[in-house]
Design a protein with these regions (language model features):
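Short peripheral tails and domain-boundary helices/loops at the edges of structured domains
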Residues: 52-67
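Residue-level signal for short amphipathic helical patches enriched in basic/charged
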Residues: 24, 42, 50, 61
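Acidic, low-complexity mobile loops and tails
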Residues: 1-34, 46
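Actinobacteria-biased recognition of intrinsically disordered, low-complexity terminal regions
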Residues: 1, 82-83
């Protein structure tokens, strides 16, 4: 299984509050899809999927404080199409 972390990018503040997942484990995602939301002072920010695949694990949950650079969850890479 090839897992890719969903990493919280640097938002200009060391911490953010995790708000919600837009997808649930087992659901497919495409690169660039919004998969989660975090809140920083004065704004809510969407977190995008870094790759195509399936959300496999959530590490952050609503109300959690999360740090820039920390993984929020993992996406299993979509297997290559068979020719």
């Amino acid at each position: 299984m090839n897992l890719v972390p969903i990493v919280l990018e640097d938002l200009g503040t060391p911490r953010a509050r995790f708000s919600l997942w837009y997808v649930q484990p087992g659901e497919p995602v495409s690169r660039g899809d919004r998969v989660a939301e975090v809140v920083i002072p004065g704004a809510s920010v969407d977190v995008a999927a870094p790759v195509d695949g399936t959300l496999r694990e959530c590490l952050a949950f609503p109300g959690d404080d999360v740090e820039s650079g920390s993984p929020l969850g993992f996406i299993e890479l979509q297997p290559e199409s068979q020719s």
